[in-house]
Amino acid sequence: MAMKILPVCPFSRYLAVLVLAFAAKGAEVSVDELLEQAGVSFAKGMRENAIELANNAIEAEPKNARAYYVRGRFYAEMRQVQKAMSDFNRALLFDPSLALAYYHRGAENFILGHIKESAGDFDRFLDLAPGQAPKLWQRGIALYYAGRYEDGRRQFELHQTINRNDVENAVWHFLCVARSSGIDKSRVSLLKVENDPRVPMMQIYALYAGRGSAEEVMKAATAGKPSPPELNERTFYAHFYLGLYFDVAGNEKMAREHIFQAADLFKVDSYMGDVARIHAALLRQQSH
């Protein structure tokens, strides 16, 4: 999605702030320095070196929650989900109040298809950091797949307060309302979006608003002369949000056709790519 959440600054800078905060609690300086160096190395693309430095920090202090958290962040960025999960679990074992570990474990749980656990982690993150609630669009998506549609609706309404021109947020709000109250109600309560510059988002918005068509979405996605990566991304989003629309409208055939194209033929290496993959897996489970 276009929507972003923590960290909002470069990872190495964010990590430096994190380790300084822990240093104030009396953590060993040597471990802090190792983790800061690891963050700088990772930001420079020296990933193996960053992992080695994090390993050294863990060896120096095996029960240091932040060391596992930092290494888990590295593994998550490297798309090594199981290793990231293991480190976030250990971080929370040693410090159950480490809010960001719940947030990142929630994202990894979702990627693994552990929907209920993902929603629970995001809930716990908000318990510990309630001020972050408007930013947490990932929680809204987890709530949708967990069947907690009213909670999801409220989450996307919160996000609208800080991100008013994101069609995806409006679409997920639509989906939550449609599941709980029907499509007619969801159109009446569709969140207002005036200008999402990403192609073909405004055509997707028109479809959900009841004044557009699937043909217009696909035509917009392939218009002009986008680069191959941009064309793939446009086509992914077109198929994915068409599939979600047909799914909630009860058109199983068209839903499967578009979702499978998004997840299998035009896949993208991003969180939304993972959402499409999870949705495709759920559809395949339903057919067995």
Q: At which residue positions do the language-model features occur?
A:
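Helix-start (N-cap) detector for alpha-helical repeat units in TPR-like alpha-solenoids
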Residues: 30-31, 65-66, 99-100, 133-134, ...
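Register position in tetratricopeptide repeats
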Residues: 43-44, 77-78, 111-112, 145, ...
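Canonical positions in the second alpha-helix
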Residues: 56-57, 90-91, 124-125, 158-159, ...
